[in-house]
């Protein structure tokens, strides 16, 4: 699906809201007579020939920034008021009535806002119409203002339009809604939903209605149901993904389409408690996941410490970048906002990350060059520039020559570098692997030993490409999301646990790995990014993947000891990472990645080596070997495809009132449950049927005199 950036409309009006100018803004530079904007313009305003401008209003702007942009666009310097016929912009009323400066205004009830355009105007991605009026032409001139345009916004817009025609906006989108509402469903509503699901598509959607408390699921066997615990309805799609679940009081919705199709004859009240949407956008053309911006763009994104994660300016939208896809998490649903932010990411990637990166390193500050080569007073690791080759030097490649005492590297600009250490130690020319991996830059430094065996040397001297996923030797502190080529330490408690007695050597004054025979660290998973937001998500992931996962200071194991696999995961900012072992030899650049010693943590599993019964009741038995019903393993896949609803046994007010004096003397962990059980057993023993026998007091006085206190 190709995303089309919608046109935008700016209407500049004078007194009486008479339209003075109509500006049709589009990055395509041509009028789209099939667009909703043009339909509105031609049908409602009777205008068919607007001014066409190859411009674009960024939907990430705040209202004050938008006013500055509009003043520049219209080339005006007087106070203005901006508004819209569809949404409130700069001003609004308490009751959210649409503000219009040409309509009678209750000034005292006006509320001014400086929010972000895409939040204030939710449909802006598809249909943006902004009205601009000179403040003096309205009855509320004192509410107008003038704003200077932010030149960085204009610079960004210019560069955006320069690359726009070459952008590949083909994308496929998967979405997951995480909405929690407070509802009035209760038991009756859940029953209706079960029946609707079975009627709608019982073969494809699996549903389960069960009764539970906070500790375990209560299967009732042949005993009477005590309804003091909550019910829960869960519905799965054909892929086993939860579409929605409800306990009657609240409901969590992931599949909005299915849920709304079930509500045609159910009177449902819903109050949003929490809501967010996660989009996964698959791109047709790969992008650079490490975005680096070289102009001010805080009006669009906030850069984070992790260079493949961006936040929106209001920090309510998070964006995770990968080579072939983008993950976007939005706090509240905004139509097509995921497509718009993907468009911005693709544009920025084209604007700032396709530049030639193999620039002449000699242009970089000398001080910085000395620092990255770790040059000191007694360590001469910064190469010097020489003017010519010695006669006795032999050619190794087109850009490298050597003799028995000297090596010379020639960069793409023809500048010759050599290592002439006065202490005669650092005489070998080599290259910094980190710069080559990240930027394809061959940065010469001086080394103690010959570097011709390294992959970076082969790439810079012999033009042999190295694997793009080579691990960066710098080990990050734990806590940040780890990108594909990087590794980080484990949390202190687990670092001590996994690496007890293991030796690791770092380069002096930094955390660059120099040598280790095997050290446990954290790396990103090779698979797609996987988020686990709740404990339920964690438990489901661990049992499905059948591997160990560490989240904060808790270790999660699969239910069955025999199922535990050989991988160990760790959760960082809701994203699944992997624990691995790295090995590195001091004389080599390559970092070897090995599986973790999973047995260290597997041995912590609280397993029972002997058969034991955990709990037994009513023919059901929970044991260390599984769940048994009447002595046989219970392995039936529970489902509510076939449902039978029975009438609840209720206890009349007369009965509970009669025994109330007795219950005052009852001391038990669950008094309500004791009372219900007592009353139900009394009804059964006396054969009381409320539908047939309404006068039960004489029976109670006969068999339970003195309110049951004496028998």
Swiss-Prot record:
GO terms for biological process: positive regulation of DNA-templated transcription. Keywords: Activator, DNA-binding, Transcription, Transcription regulation. GO terms for molecular function: DNA binding. Disulfide bonds: none annotated. InterPro entries: Poxvirus_early-TF_lsu (IPR007532). Heterodimer of a 70 kDa and a 82 kDa subunit. Part of the early transcription complex composed of ETF, RAP94, and the DNA-directed RNA polymerase. Acts with RNA polymerase to initiate transcription from early gene promoters. Is recruited by the RPO-associated protein of 94 kDa (RAP94) to form the early transcription complex, which also contains the core RNA polymerase. ETF heterodimer binds to early gene promoters. Belongs to the poxviridae VETF large subunit family. This is Early transcription factor 82 kDa subunit. It comes from Rabbit fibroma virus (strain Kasza). The gene is VETFL.
């Amino acid at each position: 699906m190709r995303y089309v950036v919608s046109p935008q409309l700016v209407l500049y009006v004078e007194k009486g809201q008479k339209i003075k100018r109509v500006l049709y803004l589009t990055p395509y530079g041509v009028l789209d007579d099939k667009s909703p904007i043009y339909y509105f313009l031609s049908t409602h305003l009777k205008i068919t020939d607007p001014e066409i401008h190859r411009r674009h209003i960024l939907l990430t702007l705040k209202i004050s920034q938008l006013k500055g942009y509009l003043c520049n666009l219209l080339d005006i310097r007087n106070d203005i008021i901006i508004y819209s016929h569809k949404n409130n912009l700069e001003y609004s009323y308490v009751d959210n009535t649409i503000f219009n400066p040409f309509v009678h205004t209750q000034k005292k009830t006006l509320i001014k806002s400086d929010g972000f355009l895409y939040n204030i105007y939710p449909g802006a991605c598809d249909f943006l119409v902004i009205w601009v009026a000179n403040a003096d032409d309205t009855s509320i001139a004192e509410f107008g203002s003038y704003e200077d345009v932010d030149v960085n916004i204009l610079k960004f817009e210019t560069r955006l339009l320069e690359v726009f025609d070459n952008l590949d906006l083909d994308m496929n989108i998967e979405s997951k809604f995480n909405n929690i509402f407070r509802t009035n469903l209760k038991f009756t509503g859940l029953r209706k939903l079960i029946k609707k699901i079975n009627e709608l598509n019982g073969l494809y959607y699996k549903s389960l209605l069960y009764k539970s408390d906070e500790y375990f699921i209560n299967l009732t066997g042949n005993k009477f149901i005590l309804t003091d615990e909550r019910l829960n309805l869960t519905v799965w799609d054909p892929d086993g993904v939860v579409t929605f679940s409800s306990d009657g009081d609240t409901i969590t919705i992931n599949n909005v389409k299915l849920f709304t199709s079930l509500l045609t004859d159910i009177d449902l009240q819903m109050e949003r408690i929490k809501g967010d949407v996660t989009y996964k956008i698959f791109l047709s053309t790969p992008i650079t996941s490490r975005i680096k911006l070289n102009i001010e763009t805080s009006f669009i994104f906030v850069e984070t410490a992790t260079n493949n994660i961006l936040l929106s300016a209001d920090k309510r939208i998070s964006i995770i970048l990968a080579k072939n896809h983008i993950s976007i998490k939005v706090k509240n649903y905004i139509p097509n906002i995921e497509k718009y932010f993907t468009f911005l990411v693709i544009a920025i990637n084209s604007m700032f990350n396709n530049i030639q990166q193999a620039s002449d390193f000699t242009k970089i500050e000398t001080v910085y060059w000395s620092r990255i080569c770790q040059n000191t007073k007694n360590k001469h690791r910064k190469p010097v520039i020489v003017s010519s080759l010695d006669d006795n030097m032999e050619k190794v490649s087109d850009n490298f020559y050597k003799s028995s005492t000297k090596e010379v590297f020639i960069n793409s600009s023809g500048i010759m570098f050599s290592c002439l250490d006065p202490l005669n130690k650092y005489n070998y020319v080599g290259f910094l692997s980190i710069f080559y991996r990240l930027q394809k830059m061959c940065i010469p430094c001086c080394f103690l030993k010959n570097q011709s065996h390294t992959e970076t040397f082969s790439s810079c001297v012999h033009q042999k490409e190295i694997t793009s996923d080579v691990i960066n030797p710098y080990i990050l502190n734990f806590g940040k999301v780890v990108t594909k080529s990087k590794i980080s330490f484990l949390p202190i408690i687990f670092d001590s646990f996994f690496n007890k007695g293991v030796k690791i050597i770092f380069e002096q004054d930094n955390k660059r790995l120099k040598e280790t025979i095997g050290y446990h660290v954290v790396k990103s998973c090779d698979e797609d990014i996987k988020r686990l937001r709740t404990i339920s998500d964690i438990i489901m992931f661990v049992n499905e993947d059948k591997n160990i996962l560490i989240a904060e200071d808790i270790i999660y194991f699969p239910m069955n000891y025999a199922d535990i696999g050989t991988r160990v995961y760790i959760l960082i900012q809701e994203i699944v990472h992997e624990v691995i072992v790295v090995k590195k030899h001091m004389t080599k650049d390559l970092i070897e990645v090995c599986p973790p010693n999973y047995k260290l943590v597997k041995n912590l599993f609280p397993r029972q080596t002997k058969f034991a019964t955990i709990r037994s009741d009513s023919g059901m038995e929970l044991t260390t070997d599984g769940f048994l019903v009447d002595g046989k393993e219970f392995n039936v896949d529970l489902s509510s495809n076939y449902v039978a609803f029975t009438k609840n046994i209720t206890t009349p007010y007369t009965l509970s009132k009669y025994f109330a004096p007795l219950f005052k003397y009852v001391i038990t962990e669950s008094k309500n449950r004791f009372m219900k059980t007592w009353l139900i057993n009394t009804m059964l023993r006396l054969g009381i049927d409320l539908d047939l026998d309404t006068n039960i007091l004489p029976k109670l006085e006969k068999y339970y005199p003195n309110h049951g206190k004496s028998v």
